[in-house]
């Protein structure tokens, strides 16, 4: 009964926190599984990073590549065709509903 009444020494009180308590060494199996998990996480991270970099370079390289169907400025046939289309547009058109 005397052990219940005695107060622990200050050194023993400090050891009650989980950080300061002595830890057991990892077994070789636990160390190997920890290393395997670290390798898998690293490979996944590097794969995602490389995919993001490839997408960035692809989008940067193909920026602004589109085709317009507008006639060029110097084509006289296109200008004449546009003028004839404008002349047709001035006529009154009827729409039946």
UniProtKB/Swiss-Prot annotation:
- Extracellular-side segments: 1-36
In which tissues does this protein get expressed?
A: Detected in breast, endometrium, colon and biliary tract. Detected in polarized epithelial structures characterized by cell-cell adhesion (at protein level).
InterPro entries per record: SMAGP (IPR043243)
Alphabetized UniProt keyword annotations = Cell membrane, Cytoplasmic vesicle, Glycoprotein, Membrane, Sialic acid, Transmembrane, Transmembrane helix
Give the record's membrane topology: Single-pass type III membrane protein
Q: Where are the transmembrane segments?
A: 37-57
Q: Would you say which domain of life the source belongs to?
A: Eukaryota
This protein's GO cellular component annotations are: cell junction; cytoplasmic vesicle membrane; nucleoplasm; plasma membrane
Q: Which residues are glycosylated?
A: 2-3, 6-7, 9, 16-17, 23
Query: Do the record's keywords include Iron?
Result: no
* Principal location listed in the UniProt entry: membrane
Q: What spans does the record annotate as topological domain Cytoplasmic, numbered to this chain?
A: 58-97
Q: Does the keyword Oxidoreductase apply?
A: no
Entry comment on modification after translation:
O-glycosylated. The O-glycan is modified with sialic acid residues.
Compartments in which it is found: Cell membrane; Cytoplasmic vesicle membrane
Q: What does this protein do?
A: May play a role in epithelial cell-cell contacts. May play a role in tumor invasiveness and metastasis formation.
Q: Which family does it belong to?
A: Belongs to the SMAGP family.
Q: Which PANTHER family match?
A: SMALL CELL ADHESION GLYCOPROTEIN
Q: What is this protein called?
A: Small cell adhesion glycoprotein
Q: What gene makes this protein?
A: SMAGP
